[in-house]
Amino acid sequence: APQSAVSWWFHDPDDADRVNSTYTLAMADEVRRLCDAIPHDDLTIQWDACWETVVFDQLFDWAPSGDPMERIAMQTPVISMGIPDEVVVGYHFCYGSMHDEHFVEPTDLSRCVELSNFVVNNSGRRIEFVHMPVPIDRDDDAYYAPLRDLRIGGCGVYLGLVHYEDGGEGAKRRIEVAQRYLPHFGVAAECGFGRMDPADVVPLLIAHSEAADSLSTP
């Protein structure tokens, strides 16, 4: 999403605001051109919202002052409203994955739930899915309890609880806890594959298959 592309590089808040607004419009225009060139039923657009997710934790002393949600509110309809209805659009709420580590560890899923409720209800078009990360060591009720506060209608939820380190068994353990608060969801890796060691990709894919089987097992 726009702030994730801009805010790391412009540390003066005034500069960041000016560039963000221009970049947001440019990104929306680029997405429209993609939609003109690619058959709509072959296209899925996933907004990667990293800065938008971690900025609330006040990690960066150059982050603009004020309510971060106000900035998210300004960009949310602009980037998605012009996308044709036939195109699938979703959000990945990201805490970063450099060196297999987050910028900050999420306390629980409350921030992801808050952001999900906001983007689904304020994008000006249908949002088909949201993705939320789950650290490997979180199989406690406190992490998943905020899922009860989701207000996103029929939007799909994917929990990034699949990790190659503990495979399908670890995913199943986390699934069982999450289902106490959200009975139906899909599963995914915690973040993208782009920075992974290639040797870990096949074990992670196998873990996905085993986790998916766990979802369909009573």
Regions found by a protein language model. Give the residues of each.
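Short, solvent-exposed loop/turn segments at secondary-structure boundaries
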Residues: H11-D14, H102-P106, D197-V201
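Short loop/turn segments at strand-loop or loop-helix junctions that form parts
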Residues: A1-A5, W47-E52, H92-S97, V134, ...
